[in-house]
Amino acid sequence: MTLRDYWLNPRKYMEITRLAVPLLLSNAGLVFMQFADAMFLAKYSPDAIAASGMGGMVSWMVSSLFVGIVGYTSVITANNIGAHQEDKVGCVNWQGIYLALLAGVLTVLLGFLTAPFFRLVGHAPEIQALESEYLRVLLFGNVVFFVQASLGGYFSGRGDNVRLMAAQMSGQALNVVLDYALIFGKWGLPEMGVTGAALATVLSGLLPIAIMLAYFLRCDARERYHTHHWRLHWGIMARLLRFGVASGIQMWIDAALWTLFLVIIGRLGTVELAATSIAFRLNSLAFMPIIGLARGMGTLAGQRHGAREFQEVVAYICHCLVMSEIWMISIAATYALLPEWYFRMFSADGSRGTVDFAEVLATGKTLLRFVAVYCLGDACNIALSIGLHSVGDTRWTSIMMSIVTLILVAVLLYAGYAHWGLYPIWTAATVFILALPPIWIFRLRQGNWKAIRVATD
């Protein structure tokens, strides 16, 4: 293949775009949903947005391992399609559903431990109570998101992203409506604050499941993909666990790292925690579209890997990398130039809470410039790591992520012990993100992933 084939092939840009556009729209809906959630909570009180940022991050830390496992159904499905084993697709996704239900039971049990956990974290008492309530509701309802991740693999692995988009965006729209009603107590419903925000997230997740199941169990799906094969298949279950556990561990490591980051920031004060929580929400505006692009690319790379067309795999990853950086450079420029405009969208109404939003704004403007710098490296991380995951190279990436993360964890723990300020801690996190892309590039060029077989036997 020529250099043009790897980087400048219009057909590949079009293929990635065709699969990515529905995912981009779905992720745009998710970003809008998260923005609406954050703005409603910020207007309710700065304490509420601070608590939801920490509670949401801990929820993601707990659930990310299981989402990584059950969500790997998409990669196995894509590889099966490429290897012409369509009759195994339904069974793969049923194994993911069973694992999702089991994981849901485990997170319900963890939901009873939220209060002692946040006492251990040591945030301000009024923040602890809100964090505990928010996290408890999310953990009780996490099974909804696990089942969504497994069923979503059936659609994304086959490249059927339009139906996946329709299901996900319906839930996102419902979430915004329920958020408004349950946070502020509208339309005869009780005013529930952060608890209402968490409850809205869980309840709205049921609608996409219903829509996806309707398509999953249709007659044409049963005939072509054997989606009626619902029995346990230990061989396929073992393959899902073999690749999915490593993928889930990497996701968990990432979530645990940023949870620790928020814990340490929270000990600096509520202003710092609220500003960081809002900066993270704004960061999602940058990376969510990249995830959509990378997932579209991952489907194509997985299918080509299943067909053993390895040069095509690399070409799709390279084209996705170009598209990702173009977007990130554009959004980073607005973060650097217009930080106050972004933060003012989260200005609070009324006198609820314990901090003045003006203090949050002053701190947040600087934090958003950190985001503008590190999101350029984050684009590479997302495109390259999803590319490696799509070809089954989950164990190596998980090990390397663990090693690099331990270094940052040591720095963060020392920062907490030595009472570093907010900006030195953010500087350490930025350096960490920018250090990862060379690692993924090395692994891609090394080529060991070519010997991995992901498709079921």
Question: Can you describe what each PLM-predicted range is?
Answer:
Residues 49-108, 112, 145-164, 276-339, ...:
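Small-residue-rich hydrophobic transmembrane alpha-helices
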Residues 28, 32-50, 118-125, 181-192, ...:
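Helix-terminus/linker motif at the lipid-water interface of multi-pass membrane proteins
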